[in-house]
Amino acid sequence: MRVDADDFARPCSCGREHQIAVKEILIEAGAVEKLEEEMSEGMLREYISPLVICDTNTYAATEELMEDIYDRCQVLILDAEGLQADRHAIKIVENNMEEDIDLILAVGAGTIHDISRYIAHNYKVPFISVPTAASGDGFVTTVAAMTLDGVKKTVPSVAPICVYADTDIFSKAPQRLTAAGISDLMAKYICLADWKIANLVTGEYFCRETVKLEEKALKTVKSSIQDITEGEEDECEQLMYALILSGLAMQMIGNSRPASCAEHQVTHLWDMEVINGPLDALHGEKVSVAAFLVLEEYKRIAAAITQGRCHAKPYENEDEELLKETFGKKGLLEEIRKENEPELLETISPQHLEKCLNGIEEIIDELPSEQTMFHLLEKAGCAKTVYDIGLDESAVLPSLRLAPYTRRRLSLLRISKMLDIRGE
């Protein structure tokens, strides 16, 4: 399957002309053979000092199929155990890569891609994506999810110039990784609802075409969950296609707004380990659990609006002491304060928000029910409850209360700080 990126780079009904940096996207068996051809005699032959960034697991998974490619590259194999996209990993790459690299090949999943695109951006060299698992939607984005100074941040980076997703590689990835990819897509229900609500309440820029792209990705996966979990190659290709569509949506907008909001803010909080210890869970697993928690909270808000028990109130910073207690103990308080300046809610009047409540309810009503979402996640083998990722119920309320502060992006979870819900 060849995806024509030019289809997404055109004037849009939102008033913008979306820019797409990726030149070629190939999702099929034998895709890495095409990559080798391009490096030998095609459009990539001009690069004479390529660097492969992979880890011990992804190298083992690709060594045989990519032997000819590895022979022509500097290959940097990072230890997969405990690997994170952070300053430590960046330093390892910088200390070991040759000075004259002119191309980076990211051979791996989300963490390897974040490290690679961050390095590519800093050193102003292009990079190529070789996904080894359909585990997330970050392969073609222009941002990197990095842990910097203890805080999970989305930082400007670069998109790959080409993607070579070889079905012979990613369809054989552990089922846990594939389930994480499904989880990442199922969570789009939440972030799309948040984007619609932010547009309704504040007039924030909104692109319907990009939303349609994310919804297409969701539909593609929902209809094939059973076959994907059974490792059917054609359906695994559809999952990879859906994940790349989601990444293209982010590339079109220039940030992660179409694919990340309240549900990812919850996972960022967990990643910071200020209310919990280290979690032995994949990113997608944490995202699906967070999405389910947020869905339950949003349905609670919608029910209160329907029953006339929810009304807008003026914004007051009621969390200052909790922020000091939670983030201060790890020296992150000033970073969190800086992230949240100026306060998003100070621009919203309670009178205007009150008028928006029915519209908010309608947007929430479009979301799947808790039962439907639980069934979808269960069918795909995804994590569903806090217990699945090593947390317990005591983490739920602080997670929902503190998560909005991890990223200055408007969500209903943040807006709920201006809602007075009675009768519970």
Feature names for model-found ranges:
Residues 23, 122-220:
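A glycine/threonine-rich phosphate-anchoring loop and its flanking beta-alpha core
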Residues 1-16, 185, 301-424:
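C-terminal charged capping/lid subdomain of soluble metabolic enzymes
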Residues 53-54, 108, 165:
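Short beta-strand/turn micro-motifs composed of small residues
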Residues 84-98, 134, 260-274:
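Non-transmembrane, aqueous-exposed alpha-helical and coiled segments at domain scale
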Residues 1-103:
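ATP/NTP phosphate-donor binding region
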Residues 99-119, 123-133:
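A short, small-residue-rich loop immediately preceding and capping a beta-strand
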Residues 212-358, 362-363, 368-372:
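Active-site segments that bind and position negatively charged phosphate/pyrophosphate groups
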Residues 17-19, 44-45, 96-99, 120, ...:
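Solvent-exposed alpha-helices and their adjacent loops that cap or buttress functional pockets
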